[in-house]
Amino acid sequence: MVYNQDLSISNKTCGISDWLPPVRNKKISDIKSNSWFDIRRCLNPNIKTKFVPVNNKQIVLKEPNCIYLKYDLITLNPSSDHIRILREWFSLYAKIYNYAINLIRKMFYVNNKLIKSRLQCEIYDEIIIRKLSNDKTKLIESLKLSDRPPEFLLDYAISHACTYCNSQVKKYLKDSKNPYNKKTLRFRLWSLHKSRRVMHILPPKLCDKNVCNGLFLKLNPSKNIHDIYMFCVMSWDRLTGKFFVYKPVLKRLINIPKKQFTRCGIDPGVRTFLTLYSSERTYDVCDSTFYNNKIKRMWRKIDRINFLLHNRKKRKKRKNDRRLRKSLAKYYRKIRQRIKDLHTKTAKYLVSRYKEIYIGIYDTSKNLSDPRISFYEKRRIATLNHELFLTKLQQVADRFGSSVFAINEHMTTKTCSKCGRINEIGSSKVHKCACGMYAGRDENAAKNILKKGIKEHYLSAQSDKNVTEYNNKKSNNTNKET
């Protein structure tokens, strides 16, 4: 018998009940999320939760301290001549961005080998702008337009590339501390055939009459863009032909939702997107049935369109090729929007109910590179995108006064949450142990993540506090004796 020492703590010391929902005769109630997925809840019959009226669900702050950033969408309505100019600007922005990325790559890699001594150095915009000054002038002169882009717009592209590379280096240094993590440092280039393109702009500079003959003053925005004094993002969708500006707005948080419960543990997965456990109840978010009904159908349509576009014996351009590519982009966009809706609504639902959230780290890149996992399973992992959900959850938690802790979920599925024994369960949905514990696989893992989080962040801090108090008392007694 092998026991897990990290999880061999009793439930009583962690302040958790021994309850786990039964596998058979499980009383489940569906919670409507006003979206394409549902949340399934199972209540603990031993604990009676108090009914909270609607008026008491929010706390009104007298002095709001939390300030967060939000983006307002502004649509642009340019004429046909202006559309042609803006398209050239977007392609030029992408080219100079790729030039900067290639130059930064050469700084870190020599003969395809990473020089680790240069990782501590920060990449500065001014140095790379100086080095790419000749390339900038050549690219601007190559355009046949009368309204050529200003040089500072291309400088924004270089600074955009520098910030991206600095973030990638910081992420690599953080991940390299973990001995099990074998990720490489990558600086990705932008594809010039992307359906959606992005450009960083500063509206006060571009809205000047002397810049490009006052081009930005003639774009007919849906809202005023002259009062923006921060960097904002301008995007262009090639397939729909629409232009947008994302205006940053600072907002103060006035109401904070009251937290009904204290702690919970979350096990991210593929069959069910999230499985949550707390002493009072459990939640199952987005079961496989909802995924199959809503998203799997779209993937089938995407596969069919790709087959029509690429797998032909004699490839000839047809009239309906453009229509097929438009429909392909439409289905990709629908999947992206549905996953975004899933992430935002579940994050808000969890943060409004729990003070402390312990969530397991689901390594997407590791699972995608595993040869044992099938292609369709990998596709499902990539679409659900647990890493993106974790960042979204942390952002929403900072806004609403909750704390999120990312926990390593190593051996949490195999370990029994009652006795700490390690059992080989394989691919079964039920965890059965010799101690008499018979529960669902995901609920057991979520409970272990909760126990692990309490041990790491709560019990260890409490034990350190007790040790310091004991040492202080001991030193005081020795001083009195002397």
Swiss-Prot record:
Which is one GO molecular function term here? metal ion binding
Q: What are the alphabetically sorted keywords of the record?
A: DNA recombination, DNA-binding, Metal-binding, Transposition, Zinc
What name has this protein been given in UniProt?
A: Putative transposase R186
Its BP terms in the Gene Ontology are: DNA recombination; transposition
Has keyword Chloroplast? Answer: no
Q: Where does the chain bind Zn(2+)?
A: C416, C419, C433, C435
Can you tell me which family this protein belongs to?
In the central section; belongs to the transposase 2 family.
**Keyword Metal-binding in record:** yes
